[in-house]
Amino acid sequence: MKARAPPPPGKPAAQNVHSEQKLPHDATLGSQQSLVHLKEALHNSTLDITVVLPSGLEKQSVVSGSRAVMDLLVELCLQNHLNPSHHVLEIWSSETQQPLSFKPNTLIGSLNAHTVFLKEKVPEEKGKPGLTKAPEKSVRLVVNYLRTQKAVMRVSPEVPLQNILPVICAKCEVSPDHVVLLRDNIAGEELELSKSLNELGIKELYAWDNRREMLRKSSLGNDETDKEKKKFLGFFKVNKRSNSKAEHLGLSGADSDEDPSKSASGGDLNGCVTTPNSPSLHSRSLTLGPSLSLGNISGMSMKSDMKKRRAPPPPSPGLLGQDKVSEKASLSSQADLQKKKRRAPAPPPPQPPPPSPVVPNRKEDKEENRKSTVGMEENYETDTSSLTSSVNGVSNHSLQEAIIPDSGVDDIPVTFIGEVSDEPFDSGLFFSGSNNAAALNQGGIASQRSHLPPYQTEQSQPFIRTNRKEPDPSLPSQDYRKRNQPILANTSENENPVGIDPRVTSFVSKPSTDDPKAKDKDKMCGSGPSEKTQTGHRVNSLPVNPRVGEDENSNSALPPWSHHGQASGGSYGLKYGLTTYKIVPPKPEMRCYDRDVSLSTGAIKIDELGNLMSPHMNGSRTISKPSAVAETEAPPIGKVKEFWRRNSMEKYLNGPAECTVKKAPSTTITATSEKPQRDETKAGFTLTTPEQQPASQEYGAPPEEDRSRPHSAVSCPVKVPAPNPTDITFLKPQRRTSSQYVASAIAKKMGPPKVHADVVRPHKKTAEQGHEEAKLARPPPAWKDSAVPNLCSEAGQCEHGTNQGSVRLPSNPGGQLPADHPKVEVNSTYGKSATHNSPAAVHRNSYFLPGRSSQRDRVSVGQSCGFHEKQTISNQKMNSTSNPSQALDKAHPAPLLLTEARDSGRILVNGSAQTPGNCEPPHSQKESTLTSYIILQTEEKPSPLSADGQNSDDALPSSIFGPKKKFKPVVQRPLPKDISLHSALMEAIHTSGGRDKLRKTAEQASEGRPKKPSYVEAESERSALLAAIRGHSGTLSLRKVSSLASEELQSFRDAALMAPGVDKPQQEDRGLPPPPALPPPSTPASQVPSASIPVSRFSIGTLSNPVNARQALMDAIRSGTGAARLRKVPLLV
């Protein structure tokens, strides 16, 4: 240890130091005074000295003693005419006979001077600077030593290591005897000391001290043995301490009267110390003796604290009673503290209701339980007023119950009065939108589905308890309020029960799991999404009679959610995982019902387009109804019951994964479907043929509403809602496609659609024309892959018994690309057609305008990008056999056909080719909307109903996309071709060919093989001209080539004249019509002969003369773009 600092010095020591510091000052002052006195004494004295000159001559001189030695030198040099700068004085003493040392200002009298030598200065010769040596090459050497230290030194790389070793040892402070130089500390390769750094190729090495390592190893061994000994001893010490604790705890536990293993996390905390706010599953408790008071160990909350502190001594047996009392007091205080921090426990069960029934509310319980985890079950005690038994034993409160307290009635009559939004929705999406964290109960699903949409509940049933659950939180609150307002009804204070027609009442079974029939029905429902979407089988949904009297309207009460809102203070919430949304509904709107109106006022009406019309829409839709859709009396109840029963049976037979139910093909939908039927708004299935069902049912595609004209002869898919009383549109928003959003925006922008009554024609009016249905002669080979041989013949002709139309939907042929869509041919007597549902369920309607009375509408749908080789072409023979007068002349060019078609009312319609294949997934956009050319070809003879057809063009039907506008047909006309010789030659120069290609084409034409379209021949002419132009070499060869070209052109012209005659029988053999016109630059085959014939005729008179042909070729060479490629040849003329 360091020695302590000396005490601070005292005052006497400071005085001594001060006096010591003053002594030199006094001495200097005395020496200066003595020097002055000495100067004054020497000023008067003189000295006799002998001066020896440099030449050796001695002189005697008397000098004053007060002169300085330097002044004496100058004076003597002046006397002897010497240079004082080149001479020096050397003074000798008479006593010592040696030169005295002096300073230039030393007084000569103070020196005992006897002889003064005046000598010349010897000039000091400066050494010549030698040659500059080159600096020695050195490198920075890094020396690692003691494993963690480094030293950097600059050494010569060419010197052996044994010469550098002393420098390394001095730098690292190690002894050279025990140092070994290593290349690295990993391999331990020892370096040879006879080699230099350059030879070894290193700039870093490791100096290893053998002696220090040996000492370190020995010390490490000793430390390890010491640690082992200490550890061994410490082990016994720790065990001894822990054993003492264990003995102490055991003794304290033995002294207690209660079981120390009892511990509770919530209310009973006897003998248990838990961390606050910790759940019971993860509570870390330390079991102590119950005799220990919690007041003594209130500071201990973790095990780490127990390690630091020892347990207090056990109390005396006499104080056990007092300790227990204090323990209970501390337990109650701590329990109260934890109750504030933790979630509130389950509330007490509700009391039995008084004689006037009061609806028990569990919304607050649902709000609390919604925040809990999925797997936790909270069992509540229920009284006689609640029957919430669970089939699967999960989450009893997740049901929506409909319970009558203190009653043994099995059925609850509930009347549904109100309106339903006309927008379609998918019941399959309802399950995915309302997929909660809590599991569903199969036993109470039927009651939940039946009581989910009671629009207005009679006041005569105040016992009904409805716990609602809004399944889709994605619907915003504004939209919720907007859809809620027209549904909330007037409140009536009349509590007297009203007699209700049993046909209008839907019966709801009581959710009791003891009923074996209910269990069987639950098993029939299956599992998965069908448990929620198909549980409507327990509700016998009947069509509501439109003769519901004024009693129902007058006694209509508020919906159940308004009662819950008043009772629970607006405790609304959506269950979506663990996130809670609260949507407070607006106040109910007072709606007055007129008593003196017709009986059908309260029913829901369906317009001619299939739209649902509510009596309280206040004129929001002004759709003029045709006379053919006049309101008649309601359909018989028996037929409707059978209709729904068949639907329910088909739903179970089709499998549990189906989300929509299809109607059987034997069911006929006539104009009665447009009459007021209330329960059609609660149904959600689409009438299609059985071939179209698997695609939409297997994958759960959302059904879209296809609205067709009422008396259309073509069997179109008609949207009939599913028998599901829980389908509330504001609770289950439809998953709509982008095209439907655009269509709804367009419909709102365009205004309400109008429909003419002339569009709807009865069946007899067209049957009197005496025209038969166009029968197809032979089906195309693509039919073998399709499961739909004749869609309308099964769905339309078998049902209605008349040949009203036929639809062919062939599947994709093997050679067709996936992007190419098959042809859809619709033969209709009314000139109208509607496309069918695609698997993607995108709504498309195509209305074809009626042309003439005797027309046969042949609709050829093809993809616009696949007209070259993949297009589907109708058979000419079939067309000629079905209607001989409609056979077209093959020699007419396509522009004339298009002009004629435009004049006679034939138009191009944008359609969509959609085929619901069985193997196609529903969401594949393979059958997307395509811009297709649809050519409606009619007969040429006039008809008396042409005026009606033209008048009906003015009033077009509207669809979900809004009113359809009439567009003029767009006919793609080819650009006018310049037939001048110069342009033909320039075109020949631009489009290069070759002689080889030209000859091959000529051989094919001469052999009579199947000839390519005539635009290949025009290209051959250009190739011939270009070959003639490129083949020249000078004027002589040009003349020769031009004559050859003229002969070849003549032969090509002859072949071109024969081409139409050859092409016509080939087309007749193949049965192919001339292809439609396509936009340039690819010239159609039917238009090329009309453009190429004038050119050939013009070139016959012009190119027949070889001189004119040569001149034309020369002009083309000089003025064309090919002149730059030609090489210059000297003229031989």
Curated annotation (Swiss-Prot):
SMART domains the record matches: WH2
Pfam families according to UniProt: Cobl, WH2
A Gene Ontology term for the protein's cellular component: dendritic growth cone
Compositionally biased residues, Pro residues: 1-11, 345-358, 1072-1083
Start and end residues of each WH2 domain: 981-1001, 1021-1041, 1109-1129
Its membrane topology: Peripheral membrane protein
Phosphoserine: residues bearing it: 31, 34, 196, 219, 256, 278, 330, 333, 356, 447, 614, 924, 1099
Compartments (UniProt record): Cell membrane; Cytoplasm, Cytoskeleton; Cell projection, Ruffle; Cytoplasm
Record InterPro entries: COBL-like (IPR039895), Cordon-bleu_ubiquitin_domain (IPR019025), WH2_dom (IPR003124)
A GO MF term: actin monomer binding
Protein name (Swiss-Prot/TrEMBL): Protein cordon-bleu
Biological classification of the source: Eukaryota, Metazoa, Chordata, Craniata, Vertebrata
